[in-house]
Amino acid sequence: METPNPSAMEVNLETDQQVQSKDKPQRTELKRGLSARHMQMIAIGGAIGTGLFVASGATISTAGPGGALAAYAVIGLMVLLLMQSLGEMSAHMPVAGSFQTYATRFVSPSFGFAMGWNYWFNWAITVAAELVASGLVMSYWLPDVPSWVWAISFLVLLTVLNALSARVYGEAEFWFALIKVITVVIFLISGTLMIFGIFNDSPGVQNWTAGDAPFHGGFLAIISVFMIAGFSFQGTELVGVAAGESSNPRHDVPRAIKTVFWRIMFFYIGAIAIIGTLIPYTDPNLLRDSASDIAYSPFTLVFERMGVAAAAAVMNAVILTAILSAGNSGLYASTRMLHSMALSGQAPRFFGKVTSHGVPIYAMLATSAVGALGFVAALVSEDTAYTWLLNVSGLSGFIVWLGIAACHWRFRRAYVKQGRSLDELPYKAPFFPFGPILAFTMCLIVLLGQNYEAVFRGQLLQVASSYIGLPIFLLIWLGYHLVKKDRTVSLDEMDVEGVTITPEEA
């Protein structure tokens, strides 16, 4: 990690004057310090976390091993198409605002405004959620220490990591992600050996045929698991945000899109298959999907059956790493999003100021403060206010994915209509126009069907709690449109000019 000089925290007050027009690719003082290995691990680390280590057991319990596999495979296909769309735009136009900038330029300023604030709030509240989870995890070892002590300690750690430079963030995320990857690889190898009876008697395929397996609950159960699977994959879009500080985005972004996704899918599909084979879906421990129930993580259960005495302690440490990784990435992503909006006039302009190391310091401190307030809300509200905050941000990732598909659809059409050659693009999404259309449709189905049971039962409070994020997004979009009286950018007028990386930036 690089060590900042004494002036590292000196704020550069020239940022705004050095930024181009908001209708052009933005030149900022962000430093392109993320290497290819950073980009690879940011993409991997964004998708491997508590969704795999903890919540995967609940998906098998709900839909059976076959249903869980089907759900993750379908959501994985959707994410592949979305990441191909994002990769095409990010390699051509690598800016820290990513899809917020694309939404503003390829759809309308009001859509970009809503996308940006939606994404910023999502990750700011995610930081708060990870602070809450960190206290639960640490209580495994030190139950007498108040959770707020750990929350403050980890918030300070994450703030310092993000305050130094993008390279320090990338280095921290590289090692966080590497720990998670090593854990999954060991799990896959050990689980495979167990299936073949190396450590104990093999269960064979009996857990795939017991009861109404492999598709417990039928089609509706698979639909209900889609949302859990979708949440598990959220964070893969971080590679688009990080492209704005990649040292070689034309090469590193396509490489991350092409290779990392398949590794992630291998990890998820392999882990679900092993858990479903070794643990029956009727095991009540699979239903416990809270970070505080680490002894019942499906990974812990499998390692214990292998004879690892300290399985719970080991997995607790890994999950703490996953929590810190998510908080680290959340603070980074939301900071860059707020910074980008400030430069385009969609947030207070002082959030565009950066330090001499290229860190949007005011945007980062504001995001840290919101994360801290979210944690306080969880402490004092007996989870009521905090739960609603989580629900508001819960749909944000899916809304962003919808926006990515819509932006790519319009970008490619405008690019071709303006007479440009697709050969000039550093990376071309291979399944256009089928890809973004299918991804948009699938994502919309998952978003609207996330709590269909409450809708059918007429449970209005649960419906409002589950879907509140969607009307808030639409109100922000409509409100900005009414105030600014903007319009949808036509294909002929759309600015699809790419971003050229100068030697000074690289």
Cite the ranges covered by each PLM segment.
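Helix-loop-helix connectors at the membrane interface of multi-pass transporters/channels
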Residues: 15, 100-106, 110, 131-151, ...
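Helix-loop-helix junctions that connect adjacent transmembrane segments
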Residues: 23-30, 69, 142, 146, ...
